[in-house]
Amino acid sequence: MSEKFKVEVVTPTRVVLDKEVEEVIAPGIMGEFGVLIGHTPMLTFVKPGVLSYLENDKFIKFAVGEGFCEVLADRVSVLVDEAYAVEELDAVAVSSELQGLEQQLVAIDATADPEGYRKLTSKLKMARAKLSLASGS
């Protein structure tokens, strides 16, 4: 059995996850990164995507939004604007949300509103991550 460390996933409104796990894989801005116990301390950005953790030889997945991840030798803290476990997601509702966001993307002028465009593309990435989990992909 592998050594375990604590992982916390926290949003502004709730603690989504607080467990002892064997490994964490998170979506960083430079790509996915993995963490095992004893990892070198770091602070990094998290982009919208799928965060997974290994517990009892099984990976459990969450959809996470933008935020930060602090890695210490014996703890990982993930602070994001939103996070959802698979059982919280409805594929039909998420698919509808994704379609609406894609329509908004077509209508937005990225040059005139770069911040609005960035926020919308971030929401799109989050919706795609949620749909991936909700549909079992």
Residues covered by each model-derived region:
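Compact, glycine-rich, soluble single-domain proteins
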Residues: 6-95
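Acidic/glycine-rich phosphate/pyrophosphate-binding loops and surrounding catalytic core
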Residues: 87-137
